[in-house]
């Protein structure tokens, strides 16, 4: 299981028949489940069937299954095959963007930024892209923009999602809209104070007593260079509330990043050393420690 929630449908022998991710609503889940039950062949049998007689339907089905298994390159290949096999059928524009953005954001960087931007534009212009997918597109492009270090990349998608979720049409997506409004205030309007206000409003009830949610808020502040003194204070509270191990290490890392951003490099080193003790098998913290130690040495 690599995503939550992950659904794996198997036969009586325990052989995988289908796999999918996510639970947006009961109707969508039921549609996927019904589709899966209508073809009880195993995934291996589906692959053999496609190899023998390629169809757009099977290409798209295997693409979804591969995407749910985090085989984004395989999924991308099959979505493109589906489009080639049936040029008059669905364009799979959003699904293709989804795979390309995942490849770009992955540790191995298996996709160029230019390719992601091109597929995002195609998805935004496609008539088949749903309102929900338009929201996901804006959210994904915000993450892509952060990695690329260029906030302008997300602006047209965030603006479009804000407009699309106005009024009754956006009511089912009101929680997602709150987050989009934060990005809109920060990157489209350039108003950090308004963005911070909206970010607080977007946090769920009880967030001040949750290590994970305190960490998420503090990390948002760090990423956007907003409200750093309070962010550090809240992240330290998160450390106190966090469970020992990986969770505590993650929050310690957030405090370390904020301290480093505020110029307290020595404290960042000590915090990262604590994170390593909490999660010694995670190589990421060793890299963080080396970075912070280098900062300390350069300031001497």
Regions found by a protein language model. Give the residues of each.
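Non-catalytic, surface beta->alpha helical segment in thiol-disulfide oxidoreductase systems
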Residues: 2-42
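Charged, amphipathic alpha-helical linkers/stalks
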Residues: 31-79
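Register position in tetratricopeptide repeats
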Residues: 35, 68, 188, 223-224, ...
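TPR-adjacent "capping" and linker segments in tetratricopeptide-repeat scaffold/adaptor proteins
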Residues: 40-58, 128, 167-175, 205-209, ...
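Alpha-helical repeat scaffolds
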Residues: 43-47, 73-85, 109-127, 150-166, ...
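Residues that mark the junctions of alpha-helical repeat units in TPR/alpha-solenoid scaffolds
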Residues: 54-55, 89-96, 130-137, 173-175, ...
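Alpha-helical adaptor scaffolds
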Residues: 98, 102-105, 138-152, 175-192, ...
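Terminal, low-structured helical/coil segments at or just beyond the last alpha-helical repeat
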Residues: 249, 254, 261-300
């Amino acid at each position: 299981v690599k995503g939550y929630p992950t659904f794996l449908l198997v036969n009586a022998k325990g052989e995988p028949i289908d796999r999918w991710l996510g639970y947006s609503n009961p109707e969508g889940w039921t549609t996927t489940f019904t589709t899966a039950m209508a073809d009880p062949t195993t995934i291996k049998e589906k692959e053999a069937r496609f190899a023998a007689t390629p169809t757009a339907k099977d290409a798209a089905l295997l693409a979804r299954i591969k995407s749910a298994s985090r085989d984004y390159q395989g999924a991308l290949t099959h979505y493109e095959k589906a489009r080639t096999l049936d040029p008059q059928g669905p364009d799979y524009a959003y699904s293709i963007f989804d795979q390309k953005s995942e490849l770009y954001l992955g540790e191995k960087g298996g996709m160029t930024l230019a390719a992601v931007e091109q597929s995002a534009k195609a998805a935004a212009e496609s008539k088949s892209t749903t309102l929900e997918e338009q929201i996901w597109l804006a959210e994904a492009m915000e993450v892509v923009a952060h990695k690329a270090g260029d906030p302008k990349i997300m602006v047209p998608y965030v603006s479009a999602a804000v407009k699309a979720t106005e009024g009754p049409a956006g009511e089912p997506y009101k929680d997602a809209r709150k987050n989009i409004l934060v990005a809109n205030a920060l990157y489209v309007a350039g108003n950090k104070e308004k963005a911070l206000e909206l970010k607080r409003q977007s946090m769920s009830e009880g967030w001040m007593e949750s290590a994970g949610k305190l960490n998420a808020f503090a990390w948002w502040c760090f990423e956007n260079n907003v409200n750093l003194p309070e962010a550090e204070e809240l992240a330290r509270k998160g450390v106190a509330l966090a469970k020992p191990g990986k969770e505590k290490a993650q929050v310690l890392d957030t405090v370390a990043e904020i301290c480093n951003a505020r110029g307290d490099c020595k404290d960042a080193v000590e915090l990262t050393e604590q994170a390593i003790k909490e999660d010694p098998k995670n190589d990421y913290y060793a890299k963080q420690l080396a970075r912070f130690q280098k900062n300390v040495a350069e300031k001497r």
